[in-house]
């Protein structure tokens, strides 16, 4: 029986799943907006939000903890220098998931995942 087993499998091995969400979280922190399938977006929330909470308190131990989970120096640097201070007063809810219709090839539900309170660039508004 599958009682108390939280999280989606996505038809991948645990190592593949872990690497996928590690890469997605790093991309989210770098670009602050990514497009993915809706189930992956909902599962990414469980990975990215605790990392932002860790990024709110800068220190060697927290940086090492974040690097152990992300394995991306650039993303960890931005997490502590830019994102942590930005969300210092926010007690959670750092991500916004916006539904974006269905993918043309397989009709999978798509979604945008973005960081709340991200600076909007003028050229993005023009789109």
UniProtKB/Swiss-Prot annotation:
Q: Name one GO molecular function term.
A: structural constituent of ribosome
Q: Which Pfam families match?
A: Ribosomal_L17 (PF01196)
Name its GO BP terms in alphabetical order.
translation
| Assigned keywords, A-Z | Ribonucleoprotein, Ribosomal protein
Q: Which InterPro entries match?
A: Ribosomal_bL17, Ribosomal_bL17_CS, Ribosomal_bL17_sf
Q: Which stretch is the leader sequence?
A: none
A GO cellular component annotation in the UniProt record: cytosolic large ribosomal subunit
Q: How does it assemble?
A: Part of the 50S ribosomal subunit. Contacts protein L32.
**Would you identify the family this protein belongs to, as annotated?**
Belongs to the bacterial ribosomal protein bL17 family.
Instruction: Kindly provide the name given to this protein in its UniProt entry.
Output: Large ribosomal subunit protein bL17
- Native organism taxonomy: Bacteria, Pseudomonadati, Pseudomonadota, Gammaproteobacteria, Lysobacterales
The gene is: rplQ
């Amino acid at each position: 029986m599958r009682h108390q087993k939280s999280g989606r499998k996505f038809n991948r091995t645990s190592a593949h799943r872990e690497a996928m969400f590690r890469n997605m979280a790093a991309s989210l922190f770098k670009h602050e907006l990514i497009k993915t399938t809706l189930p992956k977006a909902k599962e990414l929330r469980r990975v990215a939000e605790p990392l932002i909470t860790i990024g709110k308190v800068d220190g060697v131990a927290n940086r090492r903890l974040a690097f152990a989970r992300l394995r991306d120096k650039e993303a960890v640097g931005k997490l502590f220098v830019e994102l942590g201070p930005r969300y210092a007063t926010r007690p959670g809810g750092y991500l916004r998931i916006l539904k974006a219709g269905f993918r043309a090839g397989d009709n999978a539900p798509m979604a945008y995942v973005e960081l709340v309170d991200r600076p909007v660039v003028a050229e993005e508004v023009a789109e």
